[in-house]
């Protein structure tokens, strides 16, 4: 059997096993699912040293291959990160179980009662690159939402993902649930991705997390619905009526708290009427933190160490200590810039003007739109969703951070007492 044929056969076997497991986990009660989550968390805490050792091997190989610093940052697990994975699973256990919830029940003139019931999606294929924590987060969220999952992590994190998967399977066994509820693809061959995204007979939805190239490929080739975002070109607009202290805090945090995340600010927009006061101050902070600044002509005139920006900079998701800066005439120009160059991820306005705040919330067409808050808050945990499986900039099926509810669907339910249609 040729290599690709074997990979295809192996993926088909994973798909069949996932479908069988999905039927079982969909019926699992809340206590069983929560017990599995607790046991996963316990195993992760217990095996911290093993997880860190596996991750250290992945990081060493990544450095030897010359991978970018942003990729290595996302790949690296710390003791704090291991604890965070376990805590995330425990927090998912505390979240309300959405499965079986009935809403919108109403009697119709015919006498029947019509409503909706929340149900699992089924089998979720999750494709991700360098973040080992996604293995635990995705397993926990998919389980609590009553789904089975097939997890395909990046080759750079294969040893970390396999070590975490051992803990996940232990938790499932402890709760009497099939280990096949959460399966990790063992091969790093890209043919496995092609097989996974075309198995419409087994997989109900694909959630990709990674670089633009990966997500574009999956979107173009998939025969299964995809929940995704391509880029995180996030903006902070500092309005004429902004409180400068708030603006400094928000802009600094949005850019420098962590460079390699999709909710990091990549472009700073500043109203021309406040630019002379604000830009030199905030840019001095950025320069002290070794952030490279690229600005339009007006911004460069105010900050001598700023490089001229080119057209590509406005579209760029740097994931690095680089920031684009533009001075705009008013809020309308800021909104137009975001509509032209943004990625519909997360954008914020800093302003003390209520009407302009409302205008920004209404007119900016992004999955998260904020007022006087850092873009770094665009996160399932910060939104009270628990760990997120990703952020969607699509408008169907889920939008924004995708937590438990985003991993479910609804079906209509009809209650009668021998009713017939006349």
From Swiss-Prot:
It is found in: Cytoplasm. Pathway: Amino-acid biosynthesis; L-proline biosynthesis; L-glutamate 5-semialdehyde from L-glutamate: step 2/2. It holds the Pfam family Aldedh. One of its GO terms (biological process) is L-proline biosynthetic process. Keywords: Amino-acid biosynthesis, Cytoplasm, NADP, Oxidoreductase, Proline biosynthesis. It comes from the Bacteria. GO terms for cellular component: cytoplasm. GO terms for molecular function: glutamate-5-semialdehyde dehydrogenase activity; NADP binding. It catalyses: L-glutamate 5-semialdehyde + phosphate + NADP(+) = L-glutamyl 5-phosphate + NADPH + H(+). Its main location: cytoplasm. Its EC number is 1.2.1.41. Gene3D superfamilies: Aldehyde Dehydrogenase, Chain A, domain 1 (3.40.605.10), Aldehyde Dehydrogenase, Chain A, domain 2 (3.40.309.10). PANTHER family: DELTA-1-PYRROLINE-5-CARBOXYLATE SYNTHASE, GLUTAMATE SEMIALDEHYDE DEHYDROGENASE. Catalyzes the NADPH-dependent reduction of L-glutamate 5-phosphate into L-glutamate 5-semialdehyde and phosphate. The product spontaneously undergoes cyclization to form 1-pyrroline-5-carboxylate. Belongs to the gamma-glutamyl phosphate reductase family. This is Gamma-glutamyl phosphate reductase. It comes from Nitrosomonas eutropha (strain DSM 101675 / C91 / Nm57). The gene is proA.
